[in-house]
UniProtKB/Swiss-Prot annotation:
PROSITE patterns in UniProt: PROTEIN_KINASE_ATP, PROTEIN_KINASE_DOM, PROTEIN_KINASE_ST
Active site: D129 (proton acceptor)
SUPFAM superfamilies reported in the protein's UniProt record: Protein kinase-like (PK-like)
Organism per entry: Oryza sativa subsp. japonica (Rice)
PANTHER family in alphabetical order: SERINE/THREONINE-PROTEIN KINASE NEK, SERINE_THREONINE-PROTEIN KINASE NEK3
Domain Protein kinase: 4-258
Keywords associated with the record: ATP-binding, Kinase, Nucleotide-binding, Serine/threonine-protein kinase, Transferase
Protein name: Serine/threonine-protein kinase Nek3
Catalysed reactions, as listed in the record: L-seryl-[protein] + ATP = O-phospho-L-seryl-[protein] + ADP + H(+); L-threonyl-[protein] + ATP = O-phospho-L-threonyl-[protein] + ADP + H(+)
CDD domains with a match to the protein in the record: STKc_Nek
Residues annotated to bind ATP: I10, G11, K12, G13, S14, F15, G16, S17, A18, K33
């Protein structure tokens, strides 16, 4: 008591008095609550000691601040708490003088009170005396809940049955002598909110029995209509007769109408960044500088290590994905074509020398990731076209003729030695999937020319022979492609001499061999009835074959020239039939 200076008495009750004091050292005002123990029942004494112990343990921004407590001469329990300059809520209601509070302010107060009660209920504490005179306002009009003289600590979620509190704020279950729990505080808070909203008590009567009847029946006058329906519904939900139907403090804080205010309070209550006094700024700055120096040192060591690793990797011939632009300036200045050519040469050499397993067993192309390693794996296959373009025409022709994407029925691989065929197969596996998967193969057929008749690599006595292919889907596609080429050429056949080899497509048709006898056999004389009969017979046989295999689309294309209004349809179809029969189809 010697540390405080008494300024004035600000309150008095049946159990004691409240004094406004000033701390002699801090020069800050506090409230000294003196609870008289003399001439009091044992229950009142226990209540005073309980309040002293409880208020010392409670720490919440919306509960009155605890400063100190002691027992003076065995006659008084002294509790020093924070001083609220704004007074209590009952005084604020009187000062309002029938001027309603704004809904925003009431919602803010409600959220603060709910946070205080939720803190107490989580810690199994019942206030049991929530009323307007125990709700205090700070200088900034913020809420502080006080007076824990009737509070009770429960060991768990048990209920209590003691009849304590202010009658006009008592809940129906307490008046009915039914055990009650934390929902009794929600009822009392609803009565406070009703009074703060309507500026009059929720339940008022001249005698105790009438008050009990009104509370038991939960008879309430309507709330002012200036407030929103959601806000009025919140207050009504807190004043429901059954405690099971009342929401808890935590549930009310989750109500959508109160969420903006909850968020605002959470932002305000976040800890400030500059909480250190001025005397510690020098030491903090020194620590920060030391930390920055250590971080920069470790970071520089990491960068040096990366550069060293990249240099070692460069010397060993392995590309590094962690290098910087400064380390690779010379590499970036080098033309991309040279880089791709070098990489392709290296990969092809490895493949030819026997390192086939890494190429042939590589997985299918997957979606490109952020790392650079998959990108390097795919580069050889993408750049192989550029490398192949630099080879001599004769070699390029042979290599392309052996690829499965050629879609020609000429068995060029029969002309190659086993060594050349093996190399061609390996190079074919390196081909990019863009040729055979992503792009139409029909468009790629024109890019694979047949070796010229004067090619030095071909044996002079060896002739290209036409072998009848098997009836498969691949041969079907080849026949279809050949059919389209021959059809475009045959349209020119009617405007010129039909015996001209250039008109018959000898330059572009991959089915033409190097034999002069074969060229003579390919010529079709329209005046020869024998050849026309053979052509028609071949047309019927081929049509029946397509019909038997249910290849109706190709059958429709074959019979389309026989439609009405076509220019020389019969000659075209007969010539095509002759061609198909000559190929063994």
């Amino acid at each position: 008591m010697e540390q405080y200076e008494v300024l004035e008495q600000i309150g008095k009750g049946s159990f004691g008095s409240a004094l406004l004091v000033r701390h002699k050292v801090e020069k800050k005002r506090y409230v000294l609550k003196k609870i008289r123990l003399a001439r009091q029942t044992d229950r009142c004494r226990r209540s005073a000691h309980q309040e002293m112990e409880l208020i010392a343990k409670v720490r919440n921004p919306y509960i009155v601040e605890y400063k100190d407590s002691w027992v003076e001469k065995g006659c008084y329990v002294c509790i020093v708490i924070g001083y609220c300059e704004g007074g209590d809520m009952s005084e604020a209601i009187k000062k309002a003088n029938s001027n309603y509070f704004s809904e925003e302010r009431l919602c803010m107060w409600l959220v603060q009170l709910l946070m205080a009660l939720d803190y107490l209920h989580v810690n199994h504490i019942l206030h049991r005396d929530v009323k307007c005179s125990n709700i205090f306002l700070t200088k900034d009009q913020n809420i502080r809940l006080g007076d824990f003289g009737l509070a009770k600590v429960l060991t768990s979620d048990d209920l209590t049955s003691s009849v304590v509190g202010t009658p006009s704020y008592m809940c129906p279950e307490l008046l009915a002598d039914i055990p009650y729990g934390s929902k009794s505080d929600i009822w009392s808070l609803g009565c406070c909110l009703y009074e703060m909203t309507a500026l009059k008590p929720a339940f008022k009567a001249f005698d105790m029995q009438t008050l009990i009847n009104k509370i038991s029946k939960s008879v309430l006058a309507p709330l002012p209509t200036i407030y929103s329906g959601a806000f009025r519904g919140l207050i009504k939900s807190m004043l429901r007769k059954s405690p099971d139907h009342r929401p808890s403090a935590a549930e009310l804080l989750k109500h959508p109408h109160l969420q903006p205010f909850v968020l605002e309070l959470q932002l305000k209550s976040s800890p400030a960044r500059n909480l250190f006094p001025d005397t510690n700024k020098a030491s903090c700055s020194d620590d920060e500088n030391n930390w920055k120096a250590k971080y920069s040192k470790s970071h520089s060591f990491k960068v040096d290590r990366i550069v060293k690793v990249d240099k070692v990797a460069a010397n060993n011939g392995h590309p590094s994905s962690t290098g910087t632009a400064k380390d690779y300036q010379e590499l970036l200045k080098q033309p991309m074509d040279e880089l791709l050519g070098q990489l392709t040469e290296k990969v092809v050499d490895e493949v030819i020398h026997g390192n086939h397993s890494r190429v042939t067993k590589s997985p299918a192309p997957t979606p490109r990731r952020a790392s650079s390693t998959p990108r390097i794996r795919l580069e050889p296959s993408k750049t192989f076209h550029a490398r192949a373009a630099e080879t001599p025409p004769s070699k390029c022709s042979l290599e392309r003729a052996s690829q499965p994407t050629r879609r020609a029925s000429t068995p060029v691989n029969m002309l190659q030695t086993p060594e050349k065929r093996q190399g061609a197969d390996i190079l074919t596996r390196l081909k990019s999937p863009d040729v055979s998967v992503n792009s139409p193969r029909i468009d790629r057929i024109a890019e694979f020319p047949i070796p010229s008749f004067d090619d030095e690599q071909l044996h002079p006595t060896t002739k290209l022979k036409l072998y009848p292919p098997s009836i498969t889907d691949q041969s079907i596609t080849k026949d279809k492609c050949t059919f389209q080429v021959l059809r475009s050429d045959s349209s020119k056949n009617h405007t010129g001499d039909s015996s001209d080899p250039s008109i018959l497509g000898t330059d572009s048709n991959p089915l033409i061999t190097s034999s002069s006898d074969w060229m003579k056999q390919r010529r079709f004389d329209t005046t020869s009835y024998r050849q026309r009969a053979e052509a028609l017979e071949g047309l019927l046989e081929f049509s029946a074959q397509l019909l038997q295999q249910e290849r109706f689309e190709e059958l429709g294309i074959l019979l389309k020239p026989f439609g009405p209004g076509k220019a020389s349809p019969r000659e075209t179809a007969i010539w095509l039939s002759k061609s198909f029969k000559g190929t063994g189809l």
